[in-house]
């Protein structure tokens, strides 16, 4: 049967299908299970790639790994034979990897954004996988900084499939433009249909639905004078498990059958191939746009404002730890723990990832599944916070010992202080129990990129009063150990912090 709209179409010559799984860390399954599933999807995609290898070129199956986060975890546990199999089909262009670590909210700090691209370097250095494209799905935008960072590491194409539910798409839509970063680095950006478009909106995989749904979109593009492309580009996931879904064997058979019976052909391609096509055939027709692509309705972070605030504070505390350790390193006193820091950044980032709650969280908020998903999501924030406080407390104690050592600086006011201190159980005079801290020198770290006015309160002298660890950070002045502080007044100073 001839596709009934073909004879009327002068513009659209091909339908391109990018098949992938949408990465939700949570929502459909417990977070740990999601990581395992995306590794399984790689194996299933390779099975389907091999199974369709004798199909016509357009219907040979292709798969794009949407995010590097779960993929890196898969590679860590994969056998050498599994890795070799992946590399074989990657080199043949049948399976691809996009460069973003996860689908993100706007919560990431600059350091997180940079670290989120570390997997790109790991994949290139350790596996010879050279990533040239990145994609985001189900969000409304990403930080302007990514236009800069992606281009700096050799990624020249960025695709986004905006979630249209209360989400405003930039223009052109659908369409491409050159996204220029803050320092005028450029990357080609495609602002396309939602990732459910292929399976849900035009019914790919089921001819009955496609015949009914596809014509409306084709006609709209045919009659849109601002649409300057000869193709329809569709992202497509699993028809049932639209999020965290596996490859669907029916897609290759559907494309093969469609092409045998229609003049308007369909073809699988990866996100990198699509970016290359835009670069070669359409770049000279693209307009340049500058500015932040703001994701403006992230309801999730607002629904858990305490944990969101906690995680944002952890961003800054971890930078304070890094600054303190940098000073200690100069004097060969550093206890820098790169593995622990890497783990903390990963947990902070997994809280800032775009998935909030379970799919049951509205209808069944008290269910085991809803509670388990939220427990893990919030755990990312709490774990990162506690581990950061522990590192910072230990690092700060080392720094305090360093600057209070007369061998380090005998002119320091703190040089006369004793690290041991006095533990008061009510048997000391007030002047002994609450000595003057004599803190004429304070280290205050500004983790923000601009000058600000602050009020500093002199810390209480309690050397050795608490274990060297997290308790140091949360020990309050009014704690019952020794009672209130009646003897020495608390001094405060207002200053500008550069």
What do these predicted regions represent?
Residues 1-498:
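Carbohydrate-active enzymes and regulators
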């Amino acid at each position: 049967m001839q596709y009934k709209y073909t004879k009327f179409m002068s513009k659209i010559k091909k339908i391109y299908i990018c098949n992938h799984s949408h990465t939700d860390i949570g929502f459909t399954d417990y977070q740990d299970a999601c990581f395992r599933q995306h590794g399984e999807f790689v194996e299933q995609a390779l099975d389907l790639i091999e199974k369709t290898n004798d199909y016509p070129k357009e219907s040979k199956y292709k798969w794009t790994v949407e995010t590097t986060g779960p993929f890196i975890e898969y590679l860590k546990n994969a056998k050498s034979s599994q890795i070799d199999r992946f590399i074989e089909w990657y080199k043949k262009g049948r399976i691809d990897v996009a460069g973003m670590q996860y689908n993100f909210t706007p919560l990431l700090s600059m350091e997180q954004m940079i670290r989120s691209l570390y997997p790109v370097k790991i994949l290139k250095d350790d596996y010879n996988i050279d990533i040239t494209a990145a994609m985001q799905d189900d969000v409304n935008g990403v930080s302007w900084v990514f236009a800069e960072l992606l281009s700096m590491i050799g990624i020249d194409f960025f695709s986004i499939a905006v979630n249209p539910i209360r989400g405003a798409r930039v223009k052109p839509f659908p369409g491409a433009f050159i996204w220029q970063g803050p320092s005028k680095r450029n990357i080609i950006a495609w602002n396309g249909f939602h990732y459910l478009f292929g399976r849900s909106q035009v019914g790919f995989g089921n001819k009955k639905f496609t015949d009914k749904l596809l014509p409306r979109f084709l006609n709209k593009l045919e009659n849109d004078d601002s649409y300057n492309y000869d193709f329809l580009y569709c992202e497509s996931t699993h028809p049932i498990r639209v999020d965290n879904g596996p490859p669907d064997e029916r897609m290759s058979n559907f494309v093969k059958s469609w092409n045998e019976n229609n003049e308007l052909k369909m073809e699988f391609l990866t996100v990198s191939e699509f970016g290359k096509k835009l670069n070669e055939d359409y770049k000279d027709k693209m307009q340049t746009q500058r500015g932040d692509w703001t994701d403006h309705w992230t309801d999730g972070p607002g629904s858990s404002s305490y944990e969101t605030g906690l995680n944002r504070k952890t961003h800054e505390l971890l930078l304070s730890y890094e600054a303190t350790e940098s000073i200690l390193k100069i004097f060969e006193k550093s206890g820098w723990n790169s593995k622990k820091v890497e783990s903390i950044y990963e947990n902070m980032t997994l809280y800032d990832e775009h998935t909030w709650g379970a799919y049951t969280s509205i209808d069944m908020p008290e269910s085991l599944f809803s509670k388990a998903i939220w427990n893990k999501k919030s755990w990312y924030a709490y774990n990162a916070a506690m581990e950061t406080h522990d590192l910072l407390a230990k690092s700060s104690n080392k720094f305090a010992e360093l600057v209070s050592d007369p061998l380090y600086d005998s002119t320091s006011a703190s040089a006369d202080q004793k690290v041991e201190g006095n533990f008061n159980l009510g048997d000391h005079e007030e002047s002994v129990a609450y000595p003057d801290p004599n803190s004429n020198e304070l280290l205050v770290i500004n983790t923000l990129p601009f000058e600000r006015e602050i009020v500093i309160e002199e810390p209480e002298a309690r050397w050795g009063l608490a274990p060297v660890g997290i308790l140091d950070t949360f020990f309050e002045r009014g704690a019952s150990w020794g009672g209130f502080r009646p003897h020495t007044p608390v001094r405060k100073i207002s200053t500008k912090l550069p």
